[in-house]
Amino acid sequence: MNLSHDLQGLKKKAKETFLYLLSALLLGIAIGAIDAVFGRVLLFITDFRSAHVVVLLPFLPLAGLGIVWLYRHFNEMAAKGMTLVMEAGQGKRESIPLALIPLVMAGTWITHLFGGSAGREGVAVQIGATLSHAFARRFHFPDNGRIVLIAGMAAGFGGLFQTPFAAVFFAMEVVVSGSMAYSASVSYTHLTLPTN
């Protein structure tokens, strides 16, 4: 009876592992494609702004008002950005609105176009987190899809910056913010040694 029970447990683990690997592949492709579009448009916008900075910079305040209008008009909840991601990762939030993806991308593009300062890493993480969280909810992953959420965040960050290992640790750090055991960091330190 123990052998039968062990085999059932092994089959369940194998099925679960396959499901996670398939999900990672599908999400990696989708998140990578969105990141690529985001990054390419951002590079184009940066070049365009550099060539026309004197004309565009005076309109930065109006661009800011336009971004506020976009969030208020389409999805005010999405304005919380990374807070939504952290709350979802900690199980405090049921969903992240999909509208966050186009809004955060458009807001960053507009900001950069008119000479404002906005980071890319937060956008990449939010793209990955939002898409992966929606996927996990749709397919009813265990633990509210926390593993899938972390993988999606890492895919977003790693896809934009081409740093997969750093992305994994960054995503884990964001989700557990403040609750990661310091002893675990000692275990991971050896992974960074070859890069120095």
Model-derived segments and their meaning:
Residues M1-N196:
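Alpha-helical transmembrane segments and immediately membrane-proximal extracytoplasmic
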